Amino acid sequence: MKPAFTAGELNTYTSPGDVTAVSRALRHTGRRVMLVPTMGALHDGHLALVRAAKRVPGSVVVVSIFVNPLQFGAGEDLDAYPRTLDDDLALLRSEGVEIAFTPTAAAMYPNGLRTTVQPGPLAAELEGGPRPTHFAGVLTVVCKLLQIVRPDRIFFGEKDYQQLVMIRQMVADLNIDVQVVGVPTVREADGLAMSSRNRYLDATQRELAVTLSAALTAGAHAAHLGGAAALRAARAVLDAVPELTVDYLELRDAGLGPAPAHGSARLLVAARLGNTRLLDNIEMQIETPAGTAGPDGDRQYAQSPWRN
């Protein structure tokens, strides 16, 4: 029996086969399928992805909600990860999303972990340092979602910047026919990057959490003095908050290779407040220490640092 689909309403499916069939039928009618993969616990950052997907002419938006066990390592917060499915579906309904895909782990991995994606050397750096299996889990589930949904475009936030880079790498290396769209990080009024994990913070930790974005802003404003100056400025802000345990603060190029001497770069930070681990990053324009612009031209560092 064909799965039912009602246009203009939220249709929820748990079976991968049902989503594949509905997506195929919609594509045959000329609709353009957009995929927003999430692990639920939706917030305004996720909704920014949904809205970006909805802006595509002729689009039908599929939001997947799946807490992927493959990307959680030993001792990580899989069981504690917030699950708010009813609230999430209500949000999607209010945004005019037409398809929610909410599979179980058994539906996604019916044969266990028989075949997985090998993510390559970048998976051992930055986030992959303390979490060596994380990106194999991320890329495997995203690859599966792409095969199940067959979207024109897939949307990710820039907050998880390494994830975005690695998904682009997988799509290019495995010749997957999809456009990967990165959406700028959505922030609270004080600059904190929105994250499902922010709800773990107590009131004191929540006040201190803004240190990450403050450090990145300081780094961006110092970037006209060179990469080393940007790192020093950011580190000084982080060091002023002893409650913060910094896992890394690194400057890289846009593809997460070595930082350039000048031009576009990414400053990335990961830190813990209590048991909560927070990530953030910012794009910046590095200039030579002499203050002269490199061949990339204008002094863009003087603009708003949140042009990421």
Swiss-Prot record:
Pfam family, one: Pantoate_ligase
Keyword Cytoplasm: yes
InterPro entries per the UniProt record, alphabetical: Pantoate_ligase, Pantoate_ligase_C, Rossmann-like_a/b/a_fold
Predominant subcellular localization, coarse grouping: cytoplasm
Residues annotated to bind beta-alanine: 71
Residues engaged in binding ATP: 39-46, 157-160, 186, 194-197
GO MF, any single term: pantoate-beta-alanine ligase activity
BP term (GO), one: pantothenate biosynthetic process
Chemical reaction(s) catalysed: (R)-pantoate + beta-alanine + ATP = (R)-pantothenate + AMP + diphosphate + H(+)
Residue positions binding (R)-pantoate: 71, 163
EC number(s) per entry: 6.3.2.1
Span list, region Disordered: 286-308
Enzyme class of the recorded protein, top EC level: ligase
Record's keyword terms, sorted: ATP-binding, Cytoplasm, Ligase, Nucleotide-binding, Pantothenate biosynthesis
GO cellular component: cytosol
Gene3D superfamilies for the chain: HUPs (3.40.50.620), Pantoate-beta-alanine ligase, C-terminal domain (3.30.1300.10)
Active-site feature positions: 46
Pathway(s) it belongs to: Cofactor biosynthesis; (R)-pantothenate biosynthesis; (R)-pantothenate from (R)-pantoate and beta-alanine: step 1/1
Subunit structure: Homodimer.
Family named by the database record: Belongs to the pantothenate synthetase family.
Other observations noted: The reaction proceeds by a bi uni uni bi ping pong mechanism.
Protein name: Pantothenate synthetase
Taxonomic placement: Bacteria, Bacillati, Actinomycetota, Actinomycetes, Mycobacteriales
